[in-house]
Amino acid sequence: MEYRQLGRSGLKVSAVCLGTMTYGEQNTEAEAHEQLNYAFAQGINFIDTAEMYPVPPKEATYTRTETIVGNWLKHQQRDKVILATKIAGPRRKLEWIRGGPNAIDRENLRAAVEGSLSRLQTDYIDLYQLHWPERNVPMFGQYQFDPSQEFDGDTEKQWVSVHEQLEALAELVQEGKIRYIGLSNEHAWGVMEFLRVAAEYKLPRIASIQNCYNLINRGYEFSLTEIGYREQVSLLAYSPLAFGHLTAKYLEGGSGRASLFKGFAQRYEKPNVALSSAAYAKLAREHGYTPAELALAFVYHRWFVTSTIIGATSMTQLQENLAAWQKPLSKELLSAIEQLHLRYMNPAP
């Protein structure tokens, strides 16, 4: 396993991060702890979770994932684990989370951090991320910015400024409750604004951005790759298997998260997702890879990806996902991937 610098932080994270969003829904606590133990035995030191998890989010399961992770974490040497979690943002109809998170402001940030610390049974969070932006942006399958959608057209409302968000996060950093901060599902303007405000007012600097990145969603490359490189903001790539679509199981009539939770991952319900997934699966098999190995190896070894977040619902899946780390792709195969990319350009934005 490789370990890489997370932005300008003092953290060295494993190149593979264990995601946890199935814990408490598709995985029991015992299964989750087995995964965590195995992953750490293989050299992973980085866990990603969120107050909103498990998915799909619902009141009946809210808090389960962080609680399960916390029950494991309390038996570990804390400084050997790099723990990341996230605050749920506004406008996602999650009324059971803190009474409905209507803003990423001082009050909500403090309540969210305190809740996560309690569930995770720890005194501090290594990387605290804003799960999605406070402001109106296209995300989770949307692909066009529409200013008329700001607060559903309510012109009296204002989103919490980046300055106010950073000031609230700075207080939590100063108190030792969080060490570093990051963004998620963010766009170029947001990243640069967080960097600008942090520099101007001497507030905490973002270390990372956690965005979707895979063979059928390479939107990060258009505007964020250069920003990440020049500003030293690390990419944490989530959904490398595109919610299972890049394993080819849905092409073969199999079941999984996309079939169990229809409508949850709308970005993968686009017209060319099946066609592009089939083309990548065919390419993988022609070169002696499984479709999942090709998809994972592609993301694992991109020069701008600091850590790839993987998730599994079984130990077999987890073992296969980690084994793909040992199978980098040849120049010939990477060239063939680029040809398919030109034919099926980002079908799952």
Positions of the model-derived regions?
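Active-site mouth loops of central-metabolism enzymes
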Residues: 20-30, 95-107, 153-160
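Short, well-ordered amphipathic alpha-helical segments that serve as non-catalytic structural scaffolds
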Residues: 35, 107-117, 165-168, 280
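Aromatic/hydrophobic pocket-lining residues that form the small-molecule binding cavity
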Residues: 32, 65, 109, 113, ...
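N-terminal binding-site loop/beta-alpha segment at the start of enzyme catalytic domains
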Residues: 1-86, 106-111, 123, 174
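N-terminal small/glycine-rich loop or linker at the start of catalytic domains
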Residues: 7-23, 84-99, 129, 136-144
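Beta/alpha (TIM)-barrel catalytic core signal, keyed to glycine-rich beta->alpha loops juxtaposed to Asp/Glu
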Residues: 133-339, 344-348
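Conserved, mostly hydrophobic/aromatic
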Residues: 6, 18, 32, 47, ...
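Active-site gating/metal-coordination segments in enzymes
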Residues: 93-129, 212
